[in-house]
Amino acid sequence: AIHGFYPAYWIEIHHEWVQPFNYLVQQNINTFFYKYDWNDCPSNVSNDFKEELKFLINTNPNITNWQIVGHSMGGSVVMFTNQSFDFNNKITFNTVATPVNYVREKTSFLIRTYEFLFRKNCKENINSLDYEFENGFINKHVQWRNLKEFDSQFKNYNFDPYDGHIKDSIIF
């Protein structure tokens, strides 16, 4: 599981994904959490995560079903990982509340200010996955989309972050 982005200026942290993961743990389902520096670009983080995932798979050969879950920006990390990960029929990459459309100019002033102050200008963003969106990812991909009006961030955008299609991706 890979968490989303929680910048310092957010007053409260939204834990909508915590309860489902608590359930997995209570059911004795192996659950691994990956912590990363959310000030780094998702495409950069995905390189390290890919190596960690390969290590986990190799050291746990008895696990036959891997559900990789990324929430929000963590979902972007998951998609960049899937972009470069070798085919493995044991893996499903899941993205939860992850945009498939990003229009930086239409994001809030706070987001743009944060990006400027921390020089977080990633050369690759969600729009860098156009090839995968058009042709599909190598491994299975499932999208768990929030309703925009209930999502703590997306409801503030004046564009639809889900206005995009990923070939062969399952959408819930």
PLM regions and their residue ranges:
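Active-site loop/turn elements of alpha/beta-hydrolase fold enzymes
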Residues: 4, 34-38, 98, 146
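C-terminal catalytic-base region of ester-bond hydrolases, centering on the histidine
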Residues: 127-172
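Short, intrinsically disordered, charge-balanced linker/junction segments flanking boundaries
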Residues: 1, 6, 169-171
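Serine-esterase "nucleophile elbow" of acetyl-processing enzymes
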Residues: 9-27
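Conserved alpha/beta-hydrolase
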Residues: 22-40
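Hydrophobic/aromatic beta-strand patches that form the interior of the parallel beta-sheet core
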Residues: 32, 94, 142-145
